[in-house]
Amino acid sequence: INSLENELGVKLLSRNRGGVVLTADGRAVLPKIEKLCAAHHSLMQTVEGLKDMDSGVVKIATFSSVSAQWLPRILKSFGKVYPNIEFEVVTGDFYDQIEGWIVSGTVDCGFLRLPSVKRLQTYALHRDELQVIVPCDHPYADRDPFPVSALAEEPFIQLEEGDDYEIMAAFDEMGIRPNVKYIAREDRTILAMVSEGLGISLLPELMVRHSPTPIKVCHAPLHFYRTIGIGVKDKKALSNSTRLFVDYVRTWVTENGNT
C-alpha cells in the first residue's frame, strides 16, 4: 500500500491506533482498483483456459506446393485431435514474403525454404529433390537421369526469380546455363506448359507430385535439393495452439511427407 500511495502521490489509508480506514482519496479510487483487480483475474482465467483448453486461432503462411500436397491433409488430421483450434491460411508468392510476415507478426508460423534469410527460429521438415520434367512424348522422356547437354539445349521454363535459388544453383554446379524461353510464377502453370510441349523445367519434387496434367518426371544428372522447414519468430513466445500445431507438423511430415 505504501508503494502504491507513493506512486499515486495520494494518501489512501488513514492509520491510527484503532486500525486503518480509507481516506477520501482512497474511497474515490477504490472502485477503479476493484475493476483493475477483476480485469486482471479475468485475464488470468482466460490465459489458464488457453493453456488447459486446446483452443485458439493459428495464422499460417504457406506456399503453393505445400498448400496443394501437405496442408489439407495436415489440417484434416490435426482437426480430429484438436477440434477447437481454428486456422487462418495465407499463401505467399515468395519465400521472403513469408519470412516478412512471420517477423512482423502477421502470421504465427510459416512454411519456408531453409536456411532462413531473416534468422527466424526454424525446424527442418523435408529435403525436396529437384526433378527434371518433360512432355510425355519428349525424345529423352525415358532417359533417367536426364542428360546434362539436353538441360542446356532444350527450351527451358523457369520459375520466377525469388523462388528459383536452388534451381539456378543446380545449373551453376553442373556448369551450364538453361536456354530460358519462358518465366512463370506458378508451378502449376509450368506443369501445364511442359505438358503442352512448350519446353522442359527443373522443379522440386513436391511441386510435380500428383501433377494435374500429364508429364514425364526424370532424375536430374546430379542430386540437388531444397530444404523445406517451418519457422516462427520466437519459440518461447508461442501460443499453446501454435506450439501444438508446429509440433504436429513436424511429426506429420516425418511420417507422411513423401506420400
Say what each PLM segment does.
Residues 70, 216-259:
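A late-sequence structural motif
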Residues 52, 119-130, 134-156, 240:
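Flexible hinge/capping segments at coil-to-helix
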Residues 7-8, 29-51:
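Alpha-helical linker/hinge and terminal dimerization helices associated
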